[in-house]
């Protein structure tokens, strides 16, 4: 792993902040936009960690954040941050029974989140969902167009909710992580179920991480043309900066201008109290911040 020397303003040497930036100090040079920023995609959890995140978000002009917060933490976050935070429905990823946690229990949670004011329901369908399915005894258990997901989408539709989904992953992951095509398929294979879901359910959809394909603006252009209920978010900042930065500036500007109103801003900011603790991490998100 590349290790860079800490910047002079670094708070501490931290592998999750390889440039050693003091983000509060960096915010002082951020331009005033004249309007508030809405972050449509974040994961704000942890009583301590969220208290660190909130002033930094405000310093950069973020006035509202839509967060995939654990159901059990929603009351605390709402009490603490009020109208500055809204919630996106997620399953219990720590549930020991994948089939139940992403199936029947998720139906219950969708309704409970909705009662708490959530307007968006998330369907996580990165290729790793196949591993979850195999663990539960059914490779296609969490397929986006499978019976379990369709039942959940029907519920979301009845409740008047928007759907968000994570489909595919970076090209680099398919070159290094998902090399078993018999198991994971090709990257493009993951878009057929998405297209079927978009055609079947007409509510607005948000495909996270620029639809999982910032590497190919032409593909995204055709996807948006074909599905008028589809929107994309810009979350997963490092991925977006790396891949969108490869395109000529005029192509990016042209794409964003053409699809103004259907591209929404998101960061994929993750906060969890695990980040503040030494030692092994229980969750994947906790581990990512220290790797």
Predicted regions located by residue number:
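Distinct, well-ordered alpha-helical segments
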Residues: 50-51, 78, 99-100, 175-197, ...
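Active-site gating/metal-coordination segments in enzymes
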Residues: 71-185, 231-238
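Active-site gating loops and adjacent loop-to-helix segments of metal-dependent hydrolytic enzymes
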Residues: 2-18, 34, 84, 129-140, ...
